[in-house]
């Protein structure tokens, strides 16, 4: 997919087919049941692209992937926010592992970045990001976040649209999430962005997932009935007769944020986006801003989630 705005993502994330067709096979875990038994644990190791990582290194890589939201390399002042995000990511992995086993296809919301990819993305500042992710992984492994004694899925996004989605509006039974406003997210360097998708690209992605789908001949009538909340976060839409959530649509077609406006001209779909991610749960950018203002990990976690925090020693 072609990058047309300042998004903070690598160009390869917007390749029309290669990067997007892979997303078609990913199940949308966030639409499932979101609470697992208290006894769920995490695996000793995880294999990603034929490389075996210890669980701690895997968790560190998941944290690294989310640090793309930062406007500048992390400092000690950012630690509490990054640690809080790491604990939320760890909780989600524990939940997913408890219900599905650790199949990489079960992690559309828990993305991974290797240290090599970190070096390519962050360049000479990579060590600062790795150090911050290291510290956050250590904090996460000593912290359990739960809701009424159950492990739960705690979604995070890099940058919100400025208003986090109310889970009830999105049809999600997740009472531990809060509807919050994050006005400072609008000042993030990666807040505004955009991408494009050709009608042929849309057709190929849809046919890969729905081989029997009938595509309307008029390209401007293929994406319709877009419904958004008051913050502009897309809750649902219809794609060639298939109703899907905003989250599902963005993952399937590589749109970077559920807060988007779409135009279609001559078979080319253009998406203008605000924020980066699903705009639900915890905004990592907002969490870091809270950290810089003096909030600690517990205060940050408690701001975004109605959940209990337990130290594990």
What spans do the regions from the language model cover?
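Conserved, single-site charged/polar hotspot
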Residues: 1-313
């Amino acid at each position: 997919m072609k990058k047309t705005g300042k998004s903070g993502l690598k160009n390869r994330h917007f390749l029309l087919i290669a990067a997007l067709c892979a997303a078609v096979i990913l199940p949308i875990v966030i639409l499932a049941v979101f609470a697992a038994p208290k006894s769920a644990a995490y695996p000793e190791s995880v294999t990603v692209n034929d490389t075996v990582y210890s669980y701690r290194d895997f968790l560190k890589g998941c944290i690294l992937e989310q640090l793309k939201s930062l406007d500048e390399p992390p400092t000690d002042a950012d630690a509490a926010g990054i640690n809080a995000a790491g604990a939320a990511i760890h909780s989600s992995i524990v939940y997913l592992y408890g219900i599905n086993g650790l199949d990489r296809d079960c992690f559309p919301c828990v993305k991974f970045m290797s240290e090599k990819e970190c070096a390519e993305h962050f360049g000479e500042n990579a060590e600062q990001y790795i150090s911050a992710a290291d510290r956050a992984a250590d904090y996460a492994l000593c912290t359990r976040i739960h809701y009424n004694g159950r492990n739960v899925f705690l979604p995070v996004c890099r940058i919100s649209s400025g208003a986090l989605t109310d889970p009830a509006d999105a049809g999600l039974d997740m009472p531990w999430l809060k509807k919050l406003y994050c006005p400072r997210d609008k000042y993030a360097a990666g807040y505004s962005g955009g991408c494009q998708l050709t009608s042929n690209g849309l057709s190929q992605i849809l046919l890969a997932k729905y081989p029997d789908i009938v595509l309307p001949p008029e390209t401007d009538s293929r994406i319709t009935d877009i419904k958004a909340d008051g913050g502009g976060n897309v809750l649902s839409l219809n794609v060639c007769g298939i109703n899907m959530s905003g989250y599902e649509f963005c993952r399937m077609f590589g749109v970077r944020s559920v807060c988007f406006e779409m135009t279609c001209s001559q078979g080319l779909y253009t998406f203008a986006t605000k924020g980066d991610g699903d705009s639900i749960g915890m905004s990592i950018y907002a969490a870091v801003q809270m950290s810089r203002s003096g909030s600690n990990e517990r205060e940050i976690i408690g701001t975004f989630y109605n959940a209990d925090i337990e130290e594990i020693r």
